[in-house]
């Protein structure tokens, strides 16, 4: 089924490039309308088949490589090499695991987990949206549905997918799920598999969408908290002194014009703020669990622009000023990008140094990594064994996987003259990729810089 020769594999893709180049030169001028539709149908069939060609390569990388060889976890490595999003890379990895070829521990070939869906994809009958519907259907089936029934249902949906649009297939899958589980029986394993809370990206107005599924216990907990803090008159930001405990006054209740959704938002914010202020969360990466905000004195004085939190959230200056009114402040002093008077002779970074790194790096400094500061570790650019001091100018932030690459993965870190950290890959991973991370510093992309000057 698959070419085992390196030369055959390269030749096959060369032939594919050649054939596609010929297709790109085809003009529709001499074709009738039915013929144009037929050509588009053939294009769609080819597009649907291409993922089946990717699955064996992805599965090999997943099974036979490690982070050191890839330069990071597989989703990150694919996203960087293919210039796709991390989410898309993860989707392809999971799809390949379900639809791609497998092998036993002794190397014997096995059919794909979703045999019928894989065959329909290889034939060009199913597109990515069809496959997503089928995979979600199987993922959401309750635990008590046996394997033969699952396989029969999967085969039925794979056949229907070749005749219906994805939105129509979704409706058919919903009806089939009701037939297989008419009583709606789900156990703790089924519910635990679906639990999730997803925070969307910030929009132009700074707002973030939230979605997901709460377990019954989580729902009961949220209900109890909101019953108190989301009641009319409670935690109302429009009040001069919002009521956060006890019973709000009748005047506060009558003056509350918020919708139920707005009260839920404000009640949840009040609960989370109280948890942070309680100190019960302890420390996170060497600092008390808290909102860490970095901004400039100019922006504070002008009351314009945005500040950045350690989690990568942009805060309007009005929010920053309100938070700062009851916070401890830390002055960051620097000279042309280099920090002053922040070093000591201990190996571990001090709390002050960690705070400065939040403002300086804003997140993992590995090229194109988007892990925010809250989720990073402190890395010595020059190994502590060599310098015997922890100087802020020789520290940088790195997420766990990338910090490990610098420790045991053969990557070299160094500081440029402007204080930016460079990550130099080992030879087998060097394909001309960036050496520095501009993700958290988009302003650097707006002016020329000397990338090669260490």
From Swiss-Prot:
Annotated TM spans: none
CDD domains linked to this entry: HNHc (cd00085)
Alphabetical list of InterPro entries matching this protein: DUF222, HNH_nuc
Region described as Disordered: spans on this chain: 422-454
Top-rank taxon: Bacteria
Family membership noted in the UniProt record: Belongs to the Rv1128c/1148c/1588c/1702c/1945/3466 family.
Full protein name: Uncharacterized protein Rv1792c/MT1741/Mb1728c
């Amino acid at each position: 089924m698959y070419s085992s020769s390196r030369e055959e594999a390269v030749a096959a893709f060369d032939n594919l490039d050649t054939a596609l180049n010929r297709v790109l030169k085809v003009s529709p001028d001499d074709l009738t309308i039915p013929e144009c539709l037929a050509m588009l149908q053939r294009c769609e069939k080819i597009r649907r088949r291409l993922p089946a060609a990717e699955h064996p390569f992805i599965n090999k990388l997943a099974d036979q490589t490690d982070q050191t060889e890839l330069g990071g976890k597989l989703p990150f490595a694919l996203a960087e090499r293919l210039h796709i999003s991390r989410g898309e890379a993860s989707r392809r990895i999971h799809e390949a695991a379900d639809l791609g070829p497998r092998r036993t521990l002794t190397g014997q070939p096995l059919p794909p987990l979703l045999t019928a869906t894989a065959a329909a994809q290889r034939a060009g009958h199913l597109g990515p949206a069809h496959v997503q519907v089928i995979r979600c259907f199987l993922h959401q089936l309750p635990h008590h549905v046996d394997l033969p029934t699952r396989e029969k249902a999967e085969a039925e949906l794979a056949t229907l997918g070749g005749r219906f649009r994805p939105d129509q297939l979704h409706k058919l899958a919903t009806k089939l799920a009701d037939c297989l589980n008419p009583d709606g029986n789900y156990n703790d394993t089924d519910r635990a598999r679906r639990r999730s809370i997803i925070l969307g990206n910030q929009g132009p107005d700074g707002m973030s969408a939230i979605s997901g599924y709460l377990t019954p216990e989580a729902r009961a907990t949220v209900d109890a908290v909101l019953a108190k803090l989301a009641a009319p008159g409670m935690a109302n930001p429009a009040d001069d002194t919002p009521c956060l405990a006890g019973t709000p006054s009748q005047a506060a209740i009558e003056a509350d014009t918020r919708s139920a959704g707005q009260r839920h938002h404000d009640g949840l914010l009040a609960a989370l703020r109280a948890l942070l202020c309680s100190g019960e969360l302890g420390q996170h990466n060497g600092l008390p669990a808290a909102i860490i905000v970095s901004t400039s004195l100019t922006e504070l004085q002008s009351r314009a622009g945005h500040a950045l939190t350690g989690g990568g959230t942009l805060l309007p200056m009005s929010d920053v000023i309100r938070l700062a009114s009851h916070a401890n402040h830390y002055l960051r002093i620097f000279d042309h990008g280099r920090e002053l008077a922040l070093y000591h002779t201990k190996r571990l970074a001090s709390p002050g140094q960690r705070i400065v790194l939040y403002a300086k790096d804003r997140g993992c400094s590995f090229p194109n990594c988007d892990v925010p500061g809250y989720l990073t570790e402190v890395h010595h650019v020059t190994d502590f064994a060599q310098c015997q001091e922890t100087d802020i100018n020789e520290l940088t932030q790195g997420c766990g996987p990338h910090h490990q690459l610098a420790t045991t993965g053969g990557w070299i870190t160094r500081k440029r003259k402007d204080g930016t950290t460079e990550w130099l890959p080992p030879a087998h991973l060097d394909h001309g990729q960036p050496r520095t991370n501009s993700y958290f510093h988009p302003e650097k992309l707006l002016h020329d810089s000397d990338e090669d000057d260490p």
